[in-house]
């Protein structure tokens, strides 16, 4: 993917977040990269835009980001225990997120 300058900057932050072990920030930033690309990159191929919007892994990422950011009284998508006691699953999700845009 040929990223716009804005998306490239966000990707750099996502990589820095990942390297620092900030898994939640990585997931959020990777989705932000995709959001910027969809909104501003006029050179994206139509089929690729469709994949970004409806592809299984991209839908997973968008839904995961939304669950992390938006509160739901009935469920807790993340707790302090997830971050401080057992963050292995978050690390796996962050890695999966980054792989969507750098491979």
Locations of the language-model features?
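Inward-facing hydrophobic residues that define packing positions of alpha-helical scaffold repeats
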Residues: 11, 29-30
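Charged alpha-helical initiation segments
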Residues: 1-22
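Solenoid-repeat scaffolds in large eukaryotic assemblies
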Residues: 25-27
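Residue-level recognition of short, well-ordered coil/turn positions
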Residues: 22-23, 73
């Amino acid at each position: 993917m040929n990223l716009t300058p804005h998306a490239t900057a966000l990707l750099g932050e996502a990589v820095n977040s990942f390297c620092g072990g900030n898994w939640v920030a990585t997931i959020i930033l990777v989705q932000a990269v995709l959001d910027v690309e969809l909104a501003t990159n006029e050179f994206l191929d139509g089929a690729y835009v469709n994949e970004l919007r409806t592809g299984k892994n991209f839908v997973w990422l968008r839904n995961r980001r939304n669950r992390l950011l938006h509160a739901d009284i009935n469920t807790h998508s993340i707790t302090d225990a997830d971050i401080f006691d057992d963050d292995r699953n978050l690390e796996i999700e962050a890695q999966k997120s980054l792989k969507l845009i750098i491979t």
